[in-house]
Each structure stands twice: as structure tokens, then as C-alpha cells.
Amino acid sequence: MPFCMPKINPEIETFARIKVIGVGGSGGNAINHMISSKVKGVEFICMNTDTQDLHKSLADKKIHIGKNLTKGLGAGMNPDVGKKAAEETKAEIQDTIKGADMVFIACGMGGGTGTGAAPIVARAANEQGILTVAVVTKPFSFEGNQRMKLAENGLSELEKEVDAILVIPNDRLLMIADKDTGFKQAFALCDEILR
């Protein structure tokens, strides 16, 4: 029996529409690393309350969340501000992710924007029936107990809204770095892992 190639109807999309969203400073850094590393086949979106960070983004689509609330100055390590900022901009977030088959959310937990806004972004995706996966980092222990507590609370909120979550404790990354790794290099390593 001869082998026959199946007929492909060009009108049927054969690839999943994947959107990768970097939320907050760490998420934006991760997006920039992915773009610089020539990751293809996905749409990159950066969301932040801090307009200076947003201007540094290489993403095609940038969303300034919480314009009225933060005036572009960031969330000040306050997840409640990050949450309210995302809620203020929820309609734009929903429009941006519309049509995706899968959404990846990249962010760092323990600050204001990523910690507070990521669960709202995830909820917007879930409400549209989009498979939603979060890839997040937890703070280094040297960043202090307050930041770790914010991270734990944020993770608890995010877990309720995603289909799957990958948590990367930054302290574990130090195990693969050598003893001469500086702070800046350690944070760059975190961005590389999120990529």
C-alpha cells in the first residue's frame, strides 16, 4: 500500500497561539532575555506600572497598567497597588490576550507589580478559557523576610488562578553559581532561568 501524504487544509491553523506576558520588573527582564535569545513563535507582552521599566522593554506590545493609580511610578513594593493597577487596566489586558490558546506569565514574586498584578492577569486569561501557566521566581533570602512573606502571599493568590505554576527559588540558583558570583550576576542568572 503506497504512503499518501495527508491533505492539509490551509484554512485551518496548525499552530497554537501562545502569548508570553512579563509582569513587573522581573517579568519584563525575562521577556527581554527571551527576545534577545531569539525565542520565536510566541507573542511577547510586557505589563508594568513603572513606565521607565516599560520603555526598556523589547516586547512588541507594552501595557502600562494602573496609569491613573501609579502615574507611571511603579507599585513601590506594594502588591495591593499592583493588584489595583491590573484591575484598573483589566479591559485592556483582556483584549490583549484574546484569541490566545495558551498564556505564560513570567514574574518575580515579592515586589509590588508582579506579585499583585499577575493573579489578575491570570484570572483574565482563565475567564477566556485560555490555558494559563505561570513561571515565577521567589526572592533570595538576603532580600529579607518581608519580601519573602509578600512572595508567599502572592504565590497563594496566583495558584488559585493558573492551570500550572513553576516556582523557582532564587536561592537554589546560587547553588549552580560559584562563590564569586555578585548580586548583579545572580539576578541576571534568575532572568536567564526564567527565559
What residue spans do the PLM features occupy?
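Tubulin/FtsZ superfamily GTPase core signature
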Residues: 1-195
